[in-house]
């Protein structure tokens, strides 16, 4: 087991490719724009985010992602097999593209736009004023 602790004053993104391992934030990251991209990787990603824009993408592979905190705008993208759980990440605007086989979970306040091109569902809590959905596969948009 290898554990690496990284301490930085700010962090704008994380890129993971062909890797196996977990990522966990011990404290909340406050940043105007953050991006996570995971390609062909396994592991559990646990993020704590505040403010700004968050783009979280599991391009392929079985990595699972869980995020908490508050952000202004959330972009979620997934083609893999992993679960993306952002129920504890409140966001004003959520833009979702689920092409994968597992569920995405979000908590939008104002806007929810979900494109579902796979068998994975998009689950949401709250009562966003604007909801737009495009379902071209067996996955559905489901209110919890």
Where are these regions (language model features)?
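Extended, compositionally simple hydrophobic/Ser/Thr-rich segments
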Residues: 4, 11-144
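Second-shell loop/turn segments in exported
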Residues: 1
């Amino acid at each position: 087991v290898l554990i690496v602790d990284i301490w930085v004053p700010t962090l704008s993104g994380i890129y993971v490719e062909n890797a196996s391992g977990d990522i966990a934030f011990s404290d909340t990251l406050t940043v105007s724009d953050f991006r996570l991209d995971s390609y062909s990787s396994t592991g559990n990603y646990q993020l704590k985010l505040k403010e700004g824009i968050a783009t979280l993408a599991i391009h392929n592979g079985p990595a699972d992602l869980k995020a908490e905190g508050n952000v202004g705008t959330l972009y979620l993208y997934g083609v893999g097999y992993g679960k993306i759980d952002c129920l504890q990440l409140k966001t004003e605007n959520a833009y979702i593209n689920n092409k994968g086989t597992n569920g995405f979970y979000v908590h939008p306040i104002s806007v929810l736009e979900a494109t579902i091109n796979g068998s994975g569902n998009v689950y949401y809590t709250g009562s966003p004023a604007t909801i737009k959905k495009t379902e071209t596969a067996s996955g559905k948009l489901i209110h919890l």
